[in-house]
């Protein structure tokens, strides 16, 4: 029996190789994405892709007629059973409001794509219609190497890469990376886009959008969260090894300090990490220090520490990462009482040599925003350089 099970698993592993058209069945629509699987003997590797943006599975395991895809960065899994040329199962992820379980299916072959039609391509000013008011957003659609792609931009950064297809007057773009589950679907009605933004299994938010004209409807990222600048910025949290790290430790005295409030569950934080590491490595010899404050899902120290270690190793982060709390925005904000209006992960805090906050940047513009991403990375460097040029205060902060 054991031998036959091992043989079956080996045959299944080999047969899984190739491209798969995958989907999550949400309450109000279908989120499409691509899975690519490679086999080397019975060992499998693969990627989950939205257009040209791909996330590598940490492991793919086969047992009998079942396959388990793991995305350890986000504590997420896809488990499915092979039925002919189809996979049927569930996506699971543990969120701060409890586990998410969403039906999953896939069939062999390439995912259909289309170019960005002229009526859709470009920038749109959108309103997400809520029960307590409207929320401004910006939609950007363009032609990419893999067809129609785009992003959504809010006050605290972008929603990363979306990809999909469009017909004569309708469109649907998806974003799924193992953590966030997004579907943007709509139709052109006259000169207006109307549709629904889906987040997770059930959440649905109607939207309207018009061609972008005039000033942006969004706040500047530096105007979202305010800080008390009258006293030195204070923090005291433990690192993944249990060592207490505090703002008044000798390593920070008289230094420029950048504090990154992040979460390993946050794809935008993953996009920001390489830029922060590059900034640290180039300016650390000049007097820059950095600290990451991790706000995680589980609240279990051992579980959260393991995820933060994985995040640290993934990006080769050389500065301390501290366990600061859970990712509930209100609870996280309470751990940083000098900030007012904390709303976003990541939030980047720039602190001068005197220990006082000089700027707070909510969110991050990732590569999906194109030129905005490059401009933001350059802005971070300019802010640090201005602070480094200031004299070290006598006696320290």
Regions found by a protein language model. Give the residues of each.
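Central antiparallel beta-sheet cores of small beta-barrel/beta-sandwich binding domains
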Residues: 15-82, 91, 98-100, 114-188
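A short acidic/small-residue loop/turn micro-motif
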Residues: 95, 201, 252, 364-367
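N-proximal helix/coil linker or "cap" segments that precede and/or mark the start of modular domains
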Residues: 198-238, 250-254
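A short beta-strand-turn-helix
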Residues: 235-257, 280-283
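Short active-site neighborhood of thiol/selenol oxidoreductases, capturing the structured segment around
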Residues: 246-270, 276, 290
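Structural microenvironment flanking redox-active thiols in thiol-disulfide oxidoreductases
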Residues: 271-316, 328-335
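Structural micro-motif
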Residues: 316-320, 337-349
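Thiol-/selenol-based redox modules, centered on thioredoxin-like
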Residues: 344-397
């Amino acid at each position: 029996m054991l031998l036959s099970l091992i043989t079956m698993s080996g045959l299944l592993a080999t047969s899984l190789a190739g491209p798969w058209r995958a989907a999550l069945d949400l309450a109000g629509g279908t989120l499409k994405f691509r899975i690519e699987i490679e086999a080397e003997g019975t060992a499998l590797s693969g990627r989950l892709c939205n257009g040209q943006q791909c996330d590598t599975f940490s492991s793919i395991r086969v047992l009998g007629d079942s396959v388990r895809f793991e995305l350890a960065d986000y504590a997420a899994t896809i488990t499915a059973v092979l039925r002919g040329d189809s996979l049927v199962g569930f996506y699971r992820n543990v969120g701060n409001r409890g586990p998410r379980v969403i039906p999953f299916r896939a069939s062999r072959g390439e995912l259909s794509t289309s170019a960005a039609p002229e009526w859709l391509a470009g920038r749109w000013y959108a309103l997400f219609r809520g029960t307590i008011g409207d929320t401004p957003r910006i939609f950007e659609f363009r032609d990419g190497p893999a067809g129609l792609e785009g992003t959504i931009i809010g006050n605290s950064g972008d929603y990363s890469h979306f990809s999909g297809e469009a017909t004569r007057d309708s469109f649907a773009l998806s974003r799924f990376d193992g953590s966030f589950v997004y579907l943007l679907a709509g139709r052109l009605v006259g000169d207006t886009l109307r549709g629904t933004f889906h987040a997770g299994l059930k959440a649905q938010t109607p939207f309207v959008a018009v061609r972008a004209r005039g000033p942006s409807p969004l706040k500047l990222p530096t105007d979202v969260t305010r800080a008390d600048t009258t006293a030195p910025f204070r923090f005291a949290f433990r690192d993944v090894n249990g060592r207490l790290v505090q703002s008044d430790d000798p390593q920070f005295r008289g230094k420029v300090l950048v504090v990154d409030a992040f979460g390993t569950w946050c794809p935008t934080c993953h996009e920001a990490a390489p830029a922060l590491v590059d900034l640290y490595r180039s300016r650390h010899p000049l007097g820059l220090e950095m600290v990451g404050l991790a706000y995680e899902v589980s609240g279990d120290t051992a579980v959260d520490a393991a995820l933060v270690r994985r995040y640290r190793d993934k990006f080769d982060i050389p500065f301390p990462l501290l366990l600061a709390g859970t990712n509930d925005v209100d609870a996280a904000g309470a751990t940083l009482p000098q900030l007012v209006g904390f709303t976003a992960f990541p939030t980047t805090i720039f602190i001068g040599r005197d220990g006082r906050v000089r700027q707070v940047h909510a969110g991050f513009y990732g590569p999906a925003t194109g030129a905005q991403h490059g401009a933001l990375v350059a802005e971070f460097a300019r802010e640090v350089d201005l602070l480094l040029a200031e004299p070290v205060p006598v006696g320290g902060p």
